[in-house]
Amino acid sequence: GGPIFYGHAARGFNESPKHEDNAYWYQAVRANEVYQMLDGKQLKAALLGKSRGERGKNTVELSGKTTGLAGIRVGDLAADQKGHVMKVVGDLLAPFREEDSQEAIKHIKAGGIENLHLSFYRDENLGDDEVWDVWQLEGPNMVSYFRGLPHVHAWLHIREPS
């Protein structure tokens, strides 16, 4: 295994802030729903300046770390917020076969849902609408990096915990 990359430029290279007709934008919409659920202290932890950016397959290199990752720790969220993060995970895995999605969920849970960290990037906001186009979800054995600027590119890397 290793990381996978997917993307879509629905209406051309430079999409509008609403990403009309983009096949994967629903994933960012769901992540932004989590953002809307956060309170002041949580927002401060989750909203960062600039993302890691694209670095080929190293964009989603796994660190194996449970602490010191970018963003807010899912373990510090309320139960309803955690539930919504799991909906984000479900959306990330929706394009894949059911058996592959279930195996991926098993690996993510083995690394600890509470050890996932969710971050959004204000310096890469298309349209200055505070609907965050660039965000990531990272844990010890999973990284999802979503870049919706100028169109959607997304990376996903999940491995069995070591």
For each feature predicted by the language model, list its residue ranges:
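A cross-kingdom marker for long, charged
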Residues: 1-162
